[in-house]
UniProtKB/Swiss-Prot annotation:
Record organism: Lychas mucronatus (Chinese swimming scorpion)
Protein name: Putative neurotoxin-I
Tissue: Expressed by the venom gland.
UniProt keyword terms in alphabetical order: Disulfide bond, Ion channel impairing toxin, Neurotoxin, Secreted, Toxin
Places the protein is found: Secreted
Length: 54
């Protein structure tokens, strides 16, 4: 179990998370609007945009 936690922690250390640019954010807005939601969070994780709608 401890080994597993360490592994997860190591992987997390390599993850690059940045805030979305305007373009990326509007892409999220588009995605969320399709499901009739608003953007809750927009992050770029290892160069791929992740959207959270609510």
């Amino acid at each position: 179990c401890i080994i597993l936690l360490l592994t997860i922690f190591e992987i997390n250390a390599d993850v690059k998370v940045t805030d979305c640019s305007k373009d990326e954010y509007s892409w999220c807005v588009e995605k969320c609007t399709k499901v009739r939601s608003k953007v809750r969070q927009c992050k770029v994780i290892n160069d791929s945009v992740k959207c959270q709608c609510h």
